[in-house]
Every structure is written in C-alpha cells, then in structure tokens.
C-alpha cells in the first residue's frame, strides 16, 4: 500500500535531495562548458520537486538554436499499410517515420527506435510534420545529446475519421503489423523482424506517447515489456494499474519508465503527480534518474498540455540516458 504523502517525502525526498542537487550542479556545469564550445546557451533548469512530491528536474533547451534548421537534417517519410485486426473490415492506415541524417538504405548501421503516439484530436503528422520538432531532433543528434535514432508516429485509431480505437486489439496491431513492417523496412537493432529479433533488441526500442498517446503507452506496457525496455508516457494517466503490476511481477526483464508532465496549466498535472507519487512509493519500482540503479523517473515541467511539448520531454529523456 502506498505510503502517506508526508511519510513518502520524509523517506524518499530527504534521502535523495542531495544527490539530485549534485546531479543538477553537474548538468549545469557540463552544459556550461559545452555551450562555450558550440555557441548556444545552457539549458534552463527547472526544479519542480516541491510540486511533484518527488525529486525531479527539467531542462529546457535553447529554442533559438534547437528549433532552427540544422545543417545535418534528417528526413520524414510516410508509410501506408492495411490492418485486419478490427473485425471483418480492412482499414487503411498511415504512419510517419523520422530517419536521422546519414541514414542509408544500403548501409549497415543500425538505429534505436521510438514509437510515438499522438494525443486525442491529433494524428501521426502532429509531431513529425512540425518543422521545429524535426529541427530539434536533428540538433539533438548533431550535438550528441542523442544517438542517431528512428522515430515512428503511428495512430491507435483504426478509423481516424470517426476517432474509433480499441485498446484490447491495438497491442496485436502493434506487434503483428506495425512493428514488423517498420523494422523489416528500416534498420533498427532487430536483425530479424520476428519475435526472436524483437526480444534480442528490446534495449534499443522505446514506446512513447502524449496525453491519450500516453494512456496508450501505459496500456501497451504489459503487452510490449518483452520487446521494449523503455516506456515514456507524457501527460497522461494509467488506466489499469493491476495489469501493469502483474506484468512487472511476471517479467524478469529490466525496464525503465520515464514519465513527464507539464505544470499546473497541464490538464493531466494532478493525476500525473498522484501517479508518480504512488509508483515511486511502490516496492515494484525504484525511483530516480539512473537507468543502472532505478526503473522509474518523473520529469515535471511548467509546460501546457500540448503534443509538441513532447520534443522537450524527449530531449530530457536523452540527457537522462535514453539509448545511451
């Protein structure tokens, strides 16, 4: 049973606040030196631990630098496919794929992959067809914040026109249609686009989403834990805690959940804070930013509730060790 809030703060926060302060100092110092070399500003640091109820940190990049065009641009391509997972009718679907600068279809390099799910009322174009977001991804890679990565933006709607979805069936579409199509077309770390290949490459695959896409990420956790080690739910609560805990107890595979949310103007703020405090106090989870020592972290910002803030959260996730 989760600890009461005041006990939780006494037990968790007091033990870790000094290490977090040291981490922030190191981050600021390292980025200060890096900024002098590259000519762009040190990220703005926000410590919202008092609002989150757990130690947290959030860094905002220099938008003037990151959101301007990059001289090493990646590309965004469209993929079309049919799904047969929803009754007798076949549905036509579209997803978008970000490929990093230098991706060569005839090359041999392999890349980690992120599957990103949009929020309600948005679609697969929302993130990747936004120029500032693509520029930011390009700069994250060119500056070394992130290793070159592939990002895939599908949709959980099987009928986008009528906003129809089925979370019971969508995990099958993800495992049997989306993932095999993407990873047989583009060179991820899956050397074979089958269950064996996906399990062997799970450390290089992440499931991510914003708002309703975050809820999709939580819903996929029990069904994707064997083939993905990283889950990044942004500004969206969990619907089925019992299924998640059961999956954690059943699996012996390590995992890391990097949860993020905006501030008081983010409509998911209160629910995400409550969830973060509950999970951080649960014995199934070890709270903190170290992927070697922990399996859950909460990045709290002062952003509004908007899909495009996902690029800021991914920036923080990369700084905190995603795919490193």
Where are the regions that the model predicts?
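Bacterial N-terminal signal peptides
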Residues: 21-29
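Positively charged n-region of N-terminal signal peptides that target proteins for export
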Residues: 7-21
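Sec-dependent signal peptide cleavage junction
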Residues: 28-37
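Non-catalytic cap/lid and distal C-terminal segments of serine-dependent acyl enzymes
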Residues: 36-324
């Amino acid at each position: 049973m989760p600890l009461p809030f005041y006990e939780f703060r006494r037990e968790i926060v007091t033990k870790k606040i000094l290490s977090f302060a040291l981490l922030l100092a190191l981050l600021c110092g390292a980025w200060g030196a890096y900024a002098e070399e590259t000519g762009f500003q040190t990220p703005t640091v926000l410590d919202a631990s008092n609002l989150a109820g757990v130690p947290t940190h959030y860094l905002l990049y220099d938008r003037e630098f990151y959101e301007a065009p990059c001289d090493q641009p990646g590309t965004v391509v469209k993929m079309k496919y049919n799904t047969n997972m929803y009754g007798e009718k076949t549905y036509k679907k579209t997803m978008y794929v970000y490929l990093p600068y230098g991706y060569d279809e005839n090359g041999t390099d392999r890349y980690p992959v992120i599957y990103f799910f949009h929020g309600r009322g948005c679609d697969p174009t929302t993130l990747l067809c936004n120029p500032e977001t693509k520029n930011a991804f390009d700069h994250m890679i060119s500056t070394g914040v992130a290793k070159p990565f592939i990002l895939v933006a599908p949709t959980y709607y099987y009928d986008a026109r009528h906003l129809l979805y089925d979370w019971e069936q969508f995990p099958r579409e993800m495992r049997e249609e989306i993932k095999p199509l993407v990873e047989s077309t583009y060179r991820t770390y899956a050397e074979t686009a089958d269950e064996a290949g996906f399990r062997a490459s799970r450390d290089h695959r992440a499931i991510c989403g914003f708002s309703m896409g975050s809820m999709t990420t939580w819903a996929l956790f029990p069904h994707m834990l064997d083939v993905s080690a990283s889950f990044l739910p942004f500004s969206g609560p969990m619907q089925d805690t019992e299924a998640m805990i059961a999956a954690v107890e059943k699996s012996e595979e390590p995992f890391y959940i990097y949860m993020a949310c905006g501030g008081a103007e983010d409509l998911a703020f209160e629910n995400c804070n409550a969830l973060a405090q509950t999970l951080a106090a649960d014995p199934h989870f070890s709270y903190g930013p170290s992927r070697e020592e922990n399996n859950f972290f909460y990045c709290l910002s002062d952003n509004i509730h908007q899909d495009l803030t996902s690029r800021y959260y991914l920036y923080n996730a990369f700084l905190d060790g995603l795919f490193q």
